[in-house]
């Protein structure tokens, strides 16, 4: 006597399919960059003086505090995070968003790599490592199966 296969769990099947369609590297970029953008947009002086977590990397790089610039950078990051979260879940334009993060991330990394002299050695390593996260994840997003067009 053969038994019928178990009925699919209709409650979890759509959720599992939705998770499989997510471009996970883009989800990670959105989660990684949201706090950065929110702090710069909402608390620009704190962002300038103490980012990240009290280390003061931005202030140490020199230059005068500029509230307008800090808020604009924060809102720009929040805007990119929204576009990233949208595309990670809809798959619409994920390659373009990943490419945008690569351009931003590599340029940001290159600038800071050329201006490490005001930071202690441990902070230099930490800065380069944390700045490398976004372009590495963005490159992974380009290679994600969800970023490729479906084959007929």
Segment roles from a protein language model:
Residues 133-152:
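Membrane-water interface at the C-terminal end of transmembrane alpha helices
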Residues 73-81, 131-134:
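Core segments of transmembrane alpha-helices
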Residues 2-35:
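Cytosolic juxtamembrane helix and N-cap/initiation of the first transmembrane helix
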Residues 31-69, 74:
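Hydrophobic transmembrane helix segments
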